[in-house]
Amino acid sequence: DHIDLEFDVGQCIQASYTAPTTGRTSVNIVASDGTVVLHVDYRKHWGGNPSTGKPWQNILIINSKLGGSWGTEEKVHDVETTIVNYDYTQCGQDADFSLELNQKDIATYAYRSPVNTVSRVQFDDQGYDAVLRKLCVVYPAPSK
């Protein structure tokens, strides 16, 4: 699922979804040239952690894809596991994205590509059992 849009500093993207029982889901903010300005990938018992050789467990992987190549991943470990419904918000600040999960600040992510080049927001359940309930843009960023 996706929405086509323009996005800039001071705006937020909200995605509400039922978390997968296993696997991964991602929310991507993509520029018109295919650059992935922001990739946030929730992994619940998925794939392989090269450090441990075991699956990733309850982690957010945050990254960007510039010129066809992924950058260095940033990770948020131990994402809450008792929650079934996730309300995820990412807001464009002056120099970075602020990321919230269920109204709790979980990370900031410095821009690696201009945020005003965004033309699409995508939600991908990667073939697992996550269910998207809402995907929208909020103008302007909600006040806390």
From Swiss-Prot:
Protein name as catalogued: Galectin b
Ranges in a coiled coil: none
GO molecular function, one term: carbohydrate binding
Keyword Cytoplasm: no
Keywords per UniProt: Lectin
Functional summary from the UniProt entry: Lectin that binds beta-galactoside and a wide array of complex carbohydrates.
Limits of the Galectin domain: 1-138
PROSITE patterns on file: GALECTIN
Pfam families named in the record: Gal-bind_lectin (PF00337)
Superkingdom classification of source: Eukaryota
InterPro entries found in the cross-reference section: ConA-like_dom_sf, Galectin_CRD
